Amino acid sequence: TLRSSSAASDVYKRQRSNEDLFIEFCEDFEFNPVIFNSFQSVGDKRLPIYHTNVMMCVATDYVIICLDSIDDKKQRKNVSNFIIESGKKLIEISEKQVESFAGNMLELINENGESILVMSKSAEDSLDENQRNTITNHSRIISCDINTIEVCGGGSTRCMMAEIFLPKK
């Protein structure tokens, strides 16, 4: 996952990624690699989370993340420190909130330069008052009920949108 606004990057150590190639890519494009493993509880097992957009949303001024899904304490601390040192506000969410798609959000910037955080109704409903206040200090929240997509498809709003980081012409 690339975060162009902060020149940072993250990757999971999984069968689907190559750490050496990732580091080389980051060096070539002047990104800072942040490598970690992330898991979710399924029954009595801890199973891998394969996409960062399930447990993390990176916005201009803040990062919403489920640090509890990073089981390795050193990796968790590295991720947390990287976020804080980048100058972004850290907003922690729980695994229960991840199940409600609270990590699957996307920041959009409208034509007036206003930050808008798009999320599902279930994600918004899972936020506590402090989390909601922290977000709304930086972004306007827009949510919609996409329960059918979340239940049948297993994804949420972030999975349905793509970012474009091209300069305006």
What are these model-derived regions, one by one?
Residues 17-18:
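Internal alpha/beta core interface subdomains
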Residues 21-133:
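Redox- and metal-dependent alpha/beta enzyme cores, enriched for Fe-S-associated oxidoreductases
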Residues 13-14, 70:
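Solvent-exposed, charged helical/coil patches
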Residues 1-8, 12:
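Single conserved hydrophobic/aromatic residue that forms the stacking wall/gate
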Residues 1, 51, 159:
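Histidine-centered active-site/metal-ligand motif
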Residues 100-112, 117, 151-169:
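Conserved, well-ordered active-site substructure
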Residues 40, 140-152:
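Short, flexible loop segments at boundaries between secondary-structure elements
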